[in-house]
C-alpha cells in the first residue's frame, strides 16, 4: 500500500495576519505587497504544530523590501482528546511568547538587564481553528534549526540551561 501524503493546511496564514505582524515589526507605514509560504522543516520533525516560513514582500517609505517570518500553525486534529491537548499547548505557548515574555523583557530593559533570548512574536491569533504565531525568523541572525536526532553538544546545552535559569529568575519580576 502506498504511503499517504498529508499536505499541511496553511489556511490560517492570511493577508490580515501577515499585515498585523508586519505592522508590529516594521511600523504602521509598512504595507504588504505579497507573501508565500516556504517550508524549512522536514517530514518527521514531529512538531506539535506546523512550523514553516512566510516570505513577505512589502513597501515602506516608497521602497520595496523583503522579510521572512516563522509561522507556527495549529494542527487540525481529528481525535477530540488530541485536539484539546494540542490546543491547550498552543494557547500556552502563544500566551508565553505573545504576552508574558514581552512583559518580562520590558522589565529587564527597565532595570538595565539583558533581555531573555527568544524570538520576537509579531502576531498571535489564538482563535480556535485559526491558531497561528508569526515570529521573528532567527535564521537572519545565523541561528539554525536544531537536529533533534543528533542531540545537543555540551556548549549549546549549557547556553539553553543558562537562559532557562534567567527566565525562571526573571519571572518573579512580574509579581
Question: What does each model-found stretch correspond to?
Answer:
Residues 38-175:
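Conserved ATP-binding subdomain of kinase catalytic cores across diverse folds
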Residues 1-50, 57-66, 147:
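Regulatory N- and C-terminal appendages and interdomain linkers associated
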Amino acid at each position: 500500500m502506498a504511503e499517504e501524503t498529508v499536505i499541511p493546511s496553511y489556511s490560517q496564514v492570511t493577508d490580515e495576519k501577515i499585515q498585523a505582524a508586519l505592522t508590529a515589526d516594521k511600523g504602521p507605514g509598512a504595507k504588504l505587497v505579497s507573501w508565500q509560504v516556504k517550508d524549512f522543516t522536514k517530514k518527521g520533525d514531529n512538531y506539535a504544530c506546523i512550523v514553516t516560513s512566510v516570505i513577505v514582500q512589502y513597501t515602506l517609505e516608497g521602497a520595496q523590501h523583503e522579510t521572512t517570518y516563522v509561522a507556527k500553525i495549529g494542527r487540525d486534529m481529528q481525535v477530540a482528546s488530541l485536539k484539546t491537548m494540542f490546543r491547550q499547548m498552543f494557547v500556552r505557548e502563544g500566551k508565553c511568547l505573545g504576552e508574558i515574555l514581552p512583559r518580562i523583557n520590558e522589565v529587564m530593559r527597565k532595570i538595565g538587564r539583558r533581555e531573555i533570548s527568544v524570538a520576537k512574536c509579531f502576531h498571535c491569533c489564538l482563535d480556535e481553528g485559526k491558531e497561528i504565531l508569526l515570529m521573528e525568523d532567527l535564521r537572519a541572525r545565523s541561528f539554525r534549526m536544531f537536529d533533534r536526532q543528533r542531540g545537543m553538544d555540551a556548549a549549546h546545552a549549557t547556553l539553553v540551561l543558562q537562559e532557562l535559569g534567567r527566565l525562571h529568575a526573571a519571572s518573579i519580576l512580574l509579581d
